Swiss-Prot record:
It comes from Saccharomyces cerevisiae (strain ATCC 204508 / S288c) (Baker's yeast). This is Serine--tRNA ligase, mitochondrial. L-serine binds at residues 251-253, 307, 407. GO terms for cellular component: cytoplasm; cytosol; mitochondrial matrix; mitochondrion. Belongs to the class-II aminoacyl-tRNA synthetase family. Type-1 seryl-tRNA synthetase subfamily. Its EC number is 6.1.1.11. GO terms for molecular function: ATP binding; serine-tRNA ligase activity; tRNA binding. Catalyzes the attachment of serine to tRNA(Ser).
Length: 446
C-alpha cells in the first residue's frame, strides 16, 4: 500500500455509533465553550463560534417541529380510526391522509437537517477548560533534578556524540527512507530497549495492565479521539494508507482508547479507574517542521513510545491526572534528567484536553528545554465519540467515563536528554542512569 498524508477513503466501514451529546448542557455552557474556542486559538474559531451561537435556536426549532409532527400524527390516527369504523370513508379521507403524509415528510426532513447541523456543531467543539489552565503561557509547577544554571554546550550535541559512538546512523536512513528517519545501532538500540523495559516494569508496578496495540487504526477512531495534529499553517500531520480508511497512529493513545469503544466498562465502587500501559511505534508526518531539530532525534517521523491510558469515573478524573503526573515525575527523577513540570496554557491544548501537563527536559546540546512527556484529562470528549460508558453505582444508569492519557516514555527525546546531560567531554563517556543498568547487563557507561 502507498502511504500518503491525506486520507483517500473508499468502501467505508464504520464501527462507531453516532456520538450522543448533551445538547441542553452545551447550550447552557455556550459562554464556556466560546471562551475555550477563543483561548485555544483554533484555526476555524470564527466558523465554530457562529455555529455554536445558532445551537439554541436550532434546538428550539426541533422542539417546535416535534410538536407539529405530534399534531400531524394525532390527526392521522383520528382519520384512520374513522376509516376503521366505516371503510366507505377511505375515498373521502384519502386526500387528507396524503396531505398529512406530505406534511409529515416535510417536517421530518426539516428536523433531520437541523439534527444533522446540531451534531456537526457539537462534534466541532473542543472540550471546555479547567479553570486552572493558564491563558497563553505555561506555568512552572515544579522543578525536577534542578540545575543551578542552564548552559548551552555544543560539545554535548547528541547527534555528534551518537554518530561518533556508532549509536546512530542518519545518512543510511535518509537513503533508505528519507529525512527525519534514523537507525539506532549498538548501544543506541540497547538504550531504547532498556528505556522501554524500565517504563513497562514501573507502570506494571503502579497498577497499569500491559497491552501491545495495533499501530494502524481506522480514520474514524483517529477522528473520534480528536487527534488531528497540524502545524499553524494547517498542514496535515497524519500518515494515511491510500484508498483505505486506515491511518498510522501518532500515539498508542488512539488504539488504547479504541479498546473501550462501544463498551460498558466495569468500574467497581472501590476502583476509580482502569489503567493500561501500551508500547507502540508512532508516526508523525511533521509537515512544516524546520530547523536543526529535524536533523537529530528530537523531531522524527517514526519512534517508539510507551503510553499510559486510563478510564475514570468523572468524579475522580482530576485525581487520576495528578497520579499520572506524579508517575511521570518519578520516572524523570529516577533517570536523573533535569526538567520542569508545566501546567500548559489553553493555546497549547488539543481539542480533547480539559487540562494538560508537560514535562520539559533541559537539553544542553540543543541549548533549550524540550518536551519529553505530557499528561491530559480529556473528560468525556473521547468517550462520547467512542461510546464508552460505565454503570453508576448509585443511580444504576449508564454514564460516560472520563479518559486520560500520559507519556510513560517518548524514547528518542529521552535519549536526547540522557546523552546531552550525561556525556562527559573530558572522558568521552555517557553515564547510564542506575535505574536502566539492570536492563543493560549492568553497563554503567557508553
Amino acid at each position: 500500500m502507498i502511504i500518503r498524508r491525506l486520507f483517500s477513503i473508499s468502501n467505508r466501514s464504520f464501527f462507531l455509533k453516532k456520538p450522543q451529546f448533551d445538547v441542553k448542557k452545551i447550550i447552557e455552557m455556550i459562554p464556556q465553550y466560546q471562551t475555550s474556542i477563543q483561548n485555544r486559538e483554533l484555526i476555524e474559531a470564527d466558523s465554530i463560534i457562529r455555529s455554536l451561537q445558532l445551537l439554541g435556536e436550532r434546538y428550539q426549532n426541533i422542539k417546535e417541529i416535534d410538536k407539529v409532527i405530534a399534531d400531524i400524527q394525532i390527526q392521522r390516527k383520528s382519520i384512520e380510526a374513522q376509516i376503521k369504523k366505516d371503510k366507505t370513508k377511505i375515498t373521502e379521507y384519502s386526500a387528507a391522509l396524503k396531505a398529512l403524509k406530505e406534511q409529515y415528510n416535510d417536517q421530518n426532513s426539516k428536523s433531520s437537517e437541523l439534527k444533522k447541523k446540531i451534531l456537526e456543531t457539537c462534534k466541532s467543539l473542543p472540550n471546555t477548560l479547567d479553570p486552572t489552565v493558564p491563558l497563553d503561557a505555561p506555568q512552572i509547577e515544579q522543578w525536577i533534578n534542578p540545575l543551578k544554571t542552564h548552559k548551552t554546550s555544543e560539545a554535548q550535541a547528541h547527534v555528534d556524540i551518537m554518530l561518533k559512538k556508532n549509536m546512530l546512523d542518519l545518512q543510511t536512513a535518509s537513503n533508505v527512507t528519507g529525512m527525519s528517519w534514523y537507525y539506532l545501532l549498538n548501544d543506541g538500540a540497547r538504550l531504547e530497549q532498556a528505556l522501554v523495559a524500565y517504563a513497562l516494569k514501573k507502570a506494571n508496578e503502579n497498577g497499569f495492565s500491559s497491552c501491545v496495540p495495533p499501530s494502524i487504526t481506522k480514520k474514524e477512531l483517529i477522528d473520534a479521539c480528536g487527534f488531528n495534529p497540524r502545524d499553524m499553517n494547517n498542514e496535515r500531520q497524519i500518515y494515511a494508507l491510500q484508498d483505505t480508511n486506515l491511518g498510522l497512529v501518532a500515539t498508542a493513545e488512539i488504539p488504547l482508547a479504541g479498546l473501550g469503544a462501544n463498551k460498558v466498562l466495569e468500574l467497581n465502587s472501590g476502583e476509580c479507574s482502569k489503567k493500561l500501559v501500551g508500547v507502540s511505534r508512532c508516526y508523525r508526518a511533521e509537515a512544516g517542521a524546520r530547523g536543526k531539530d529535524t536533523k537529530g532525534l528530537y523531531r522524527v517521523h517514526e519512534f517508539t513510545k510507551v503510553e499510559l491510558f486510563c478510564w475514570s469515573k468523572p468524579e475522580t478524573s482530576a485525581k487520576v491526572l495528578e497520579e499520572i503526573k506524579q508517575f511521570q515525575i518519578s520516572v524523570v527523577e529516577e533517570l536523573g534528567i533535569p526538567a520542569k513540570v508545566l501546567n500548559m496554557p489553553s493555546n497549547d491544548l488539543g481539542n480533547p484536553a480539559f487540562k494538560k501537563y508537560d514535562i520539559e527536559a533541559w537539553m544542553p546540546g540543543r541549548g533549550k528545554f524540550g518536551e519529553i512527556s505530557s499528561a491530559s484529562n480529556c473528560t468525556d470528549f473521547q468517550s462520547r465519540r467512542l461510546n464508552t460508558k460505565y454503570r453508576d453505582d448509585n443511580t444504576g444508569k449508564l454514564e460516560y467515563v472520563h479518559t486520560l492519557n500520559g507519556t510513560a516514555m517518548a524514547i528518542p527525546r529521552v535519549i536526547v536528554a540522557l546523552v546531552e546531560n550525561f556525556y562527559d567531554p573530558s572522558t568521552g563517556k555517557i553515564s547510564v542512569p542506575e535505574c536502566l543498568r539492570e536492563f543493560m547487563n549492568g553497563q554503567r557507561y557508553i
